[in-house]
Regions:
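C-terminal helical cap(s) of enzyme catalytic domains, especially alpha/beta-barrels
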Residues: 178-195
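A short, mixed-charge helix-start or loop-turn motif at secondary-structure junctions
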Residues: 19-23, 136-140, 171
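Gly/Pro-rich active-site loop or hairpin
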Residues: 62-66, 86-163, 179-180
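Active-site acidic/histidine proton-transfer and metal-coordination neighborhood
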Residues: 1-77
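Conserved, mostly hydrophobic/aromatic
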Residues: 30, 49, 81, 106, ...
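Active-site beta-loop-alpha junctions enriched in small/polar residues
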Residues: 2, 52-56, 81-85, 109-113, ...
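A general structural motif
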Residues: 44-48, 73-75, 101-103, 160-166
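A structural alpha-helix within SAM-dependent methyltransferase catalytic domains
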Residues: 31, 35-42, 66-69, 100, ...
Length: 195
């Protein structure tokens, strides 16, 4: 039995066994598990699940979310974290439009692709987050990766798609103090969240 699944989130074109592994993960593990969990949650008054789109998880982008929703229903939605989509090379604004009412929560979290490093090593990164000087990308205070105009458009589109609820600040910028990062991020969010 899998106790700590390692979800396949990259190409399955080679080696051929990866396609079989991915099919197993979805059809034999994930979908049956989530069908049971949604049924149990509904029986206990839970209305929504918001899964964060992180790279090593089963649901890491709109396409994988919709695959799960098709199997288990709209109770499952996305906790839209734009920072993860950015370092995966996706456009969070386009993703928000595609997600529509499947946005169940939203993070205010930014990322910076590090010039000179991302160009050499690409976006996949396994160095610890503490190794900020050598990583291809780093989590940064809101506004230190994408400018404020970008954030205004992001939150505007999220709201147009029907999400008008909490935005959780995740301050994981290790290039500044926690106090400075929180203060800077709150100031950026106050200027950019659609009221």
């Amino acid at each position: 039995h899998d106790t700590i699944p390692n979800w396949i989130t990259y190409t399955v074109s080679w080696p051929p066994t990866l396609k079989n592994c991915l099919d197993y993960q979805w059809n034999e593990v994930a979908i049956p598990y989530w069908q049971g969990l949604v049924e149990q949650a509904r029986a206990n008054g839970v209305e929504k699940f918001a899964l964060e789109n992180f790279s090593s998880m089963l649901v890491w982008n709109p396409e994988t979310l919709f695959r799960l929703r098709d199997a288990v229903g709209p109770m499952v939605g996305l906790n839209l974290d734009p920072s993860h989509l950015i370092w995966m090379g996706a456009d969070p604004i386009a993703a928000a439009r595609a997600l529509g009412p499947a946005i169940h929560h939203c993070h205010g979290k930014d990322v910076r692709l590090e010039r000179g490093l991302v160009n050499v090593n690409g976006l996949l990164e396994t160095k610890p987050v503490e190794d900020v000087a050598n990583r291809a990308w780093n989590y940064v205070a809101v506004g230190c990766g994408q400018d404020l105009q970008w954030w205004k458009e992001f939150f505007s589109v999220v709201r147009m798609m029907g999400y008008n609820d909490w935005v959780s600040l995740e301050m994981e910028d290790l290039t500044m103090s926690v106090d400075a990062g929180v203060t800077s991020s709150i100031a950026a969010l106050q200027q950019t969240i659609s009221q």
